[in-house]
A protein has these predicted regions:
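Surface-exposed repetitive/solenoidal architectures
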Residues: 1-205
Length: 205
């Protein structure tokens, strides 16, 4: 991903991908300025792990003011599936995802897994998110920071478990009032977290 380090991408118009064979951006480590524009009709039918509009966001990556809508579906034992990023080491700010995301483990509307250096701030989601475990309206597996985010997701799982792992979480002013079905390391904001979750709101359907 060295091509993107220090580079800035600016989105100046809305983009409709309904007629485009799009496979996701493999690696990105630059600045992506969405300008409040929408990339719509993203359709990813993937095999294997680590998939999203961006598969990997590096430590120096900053994605701001971007709206994405579409459907991301996976086959087999796929992990780290997200609407915006499969794996996030960077910063995702003021972004949103609307649509459908499904996978096996670590599945979220914004990111599948948010690594220790990852920051997801002031993001919004309105999606149906389905996985076997580690399922979240914002992030499936959070190891970093999730702050000031709002989820209006429907969270689903096909496997029942009676406990939830939230070890090490700083809940802050988290407000959870949403819809969660068959809890199995899943939640309206994050599925499982060893990081920080602060000032988030779940208004799930």
């Amino acid at each position: 991903d060295s091509w993107s380090v220090g580079k800035t991408v600016k989105l100046t118009h809305n983009i409709d991908l309904s007629k485009v064979d799009f496979n996701g951006v493999a690696y990105f480590s630059g600045d992506f300025e969405g300008g409040g524009h929408t990339i719509s009709n993203v359709k990813l039918q993937v095999k294997g792990s680590d998939h999203g509009f961006f598969r990997y966001l590096g430590k120096s990556a900053v994605v701001n003011d971007l709206k994405i809508s579409g459907k991301i579906t996976s086959e087999g034992s796929c992990k780290n599936i997200g609407g915006i990023a499969g794996v996030n080491y960077g910063t995702i700010g003021n972004c949103s995802f609307e649509g459908t995301v499904n996978g096996k483990t670590a599945v979220g509307a914004i990111a599948g897994i948010n690594k220790p250096t990852g920051k997801i701030v002031n993001c919004r989601s309105n999606a149906t998110v389905t996985a076997t475990n580690q399922t979240g309206g914002i992030v499936g597996n959070n190891e970093g920071l999730v702050s000031e985010c709002t989820s209006e997701c429907s969270i689903n799982t096909d496997e029942l478990k009676t406990t939830m792992d939230i070890g090490g979480v700083d809940i802050g002013t988290l407000n959870l009032t949403g819809r969660v079905i068959d809890r199995n390391d899943m939640g309206g904001i994050v599925g499982v977290s060893t990081g920080i979750v602060s000032e988030c709101i779940n208004q799930g359907k």
